[in-house]
Amino acid sequence: MTGVPETVFEELKRYVGWGDGDERALRSLHGAAAPHFPRLAEEFYDRILGHEGARTALVGGESQVGHLKVTMIAWLDELLGGPWDEAYWDRRYRIGRVHVRIGLPQHYMFGAMNVHRTGLARLAYERFHGDPPELERVRNALGKVLDLELAVMLHTYREDLLAQQARVERLSTFGQLVGSIGHDLRNPLGVIETSLYILRTRTGEDERARKHLDRIGEQLGVANGIITNLLDMIRDRPLAREPVELAAVVGGAAESVRRPTGVSLALEGLDALPPVEGDPGQLRQVFVNLLENAVFAASPEGVVAVRASRADGLVALDVEDSGPGVDPATRRRLFEPLITTKDKGIGLGLALVKRIAERHGGTVEYSDRPGGGARFTVRLPA
């Protein structure tokens, strides 16, 4: 079984006294309750949307809520219909991960579960009030299965908390190192830059010398960029918010990224996007990092594309490449600092992309490109 270890669920089932009788009791309610599942899903998300702290997590608007309601109906169907085997619990675990991923605070999830507890108890009474012993069995089974569901949610949120703590500890150690060497590195680079300026004024028409000096200047820029990225990872620079035209931002990023002649680049749908509120410099960095990765993956011959779309108050930009994609072992930690798929990378680019996107109220996700390769999707509020 993937996800939560099997022993956790087996222990939980033994702890609450789960048995065959509970499964029979839930199935006996399923037929009468099924027509009411859409209403219960509506009530569940109405409760969540009624609280601003929970509502802000649902950045996808009506489309996202509509999808979640459909998922909730299937969740209710399986809740009462089973089978309550290892695959069932694994699916529950993945659903819990979705709520963690979208940033829905756990206390709202736990509170909203009361909608199902009271709603299903009411349906059980309507179905079995003439048979008190069966009503008692159904109510007990409902209590057990809903408590197990809450345990799954708690486990997923706990996993996320532990992962966050690990990231904070890594960044803290990393930050101490960067903070101590950043200033020391800037000083010699500044001396080199000053000397480079003086040398350029004295080379005259010597094209060969100028070519080498230009290379030195380029590498100075690379070194300064690495230091800047390192420092940006450990401090929160204030966002200089203003209306940003993403077509200009992405276009500028594309022009600044070097690519071999064998790698084609296509930009699609950018001109139709509305402005977003954000920091143009930081947003440009997002697409510079993603495009540099895409070009690297697609080289020496391949395809890179940026495709834009808009739906439900969000803009989505897919940065795709025809390279080898990302192996499954790396995907889970792809956006963590110091994780890289490049032989000579230091693993900051995607971590910085994630940080900037989230500071703009957006997200970044990885998926496989149809036909092979990688796709990184950046979503931002429009």
Curated annotation (Swiss-Prot):
Provide the cofactor list for this protein: heme b
In the record, the effect of residue 99 to A is given as: Loss of heme-binding ability. 4-fold decrease in autophosphorylation reaction rate and 2-fold decrease in affinity for ATP
Q: How is its activity regulated?
A: Gas or ligand binding and heme iron redox state regulate the histidine kinase activity: heme-free AfGcHK and the heme Fe(II) complex are less active forms, whereas the heme Fe(III)-OH(-), Fe(III)-CN(-), Fe(III)-imidazole, Fe(II)-CO, and Fe(II)-O(2) complexes are active forms. The activation of the functional domain seems to be dependent on the formation of a six-coordinate low-spin heme iron complex. Mg(2+) ions, and to a lesser extent, Mn(2+) ions, enhance the autophosphorylation reaction, although the presence of a divalent metal ion does not appear to be essential for the reaction.
Q: Where does heme bind?
A: 99
Q: Name one GO biological process term.
A: peptidyl-histidine phosphorylation
Q: How is it modified after translation?
A: Autophosphorylated.
Presence of the UniProt keyword Nucleotide-binding in the record: yes
- Residues annotated with Phosphohistidine modification: 183
Function summary:
Member of the two-component regulatory system GcHK/Anae109_2439. Autophosphorylates in response to oxygen availability, and then transfers the phosphate group to a conserved Asp residue in the receiver domains of the cognate response regulator Anae109_2439, resulting in its activation.
Subunit (UniProt): Homodimer.
Q: What is the protein name for this chain?
A: Globin-coupled histidine kinase
Q: Which organism is it from?
A: Anaeromyxobacter sp. (strain Fw109-5)
Q: What is the lineage of its organism?
A: Bacteria, Pseudomonadati, Myxococcota, Myxococcia, Myxococcales
The gene it comes from is gchK
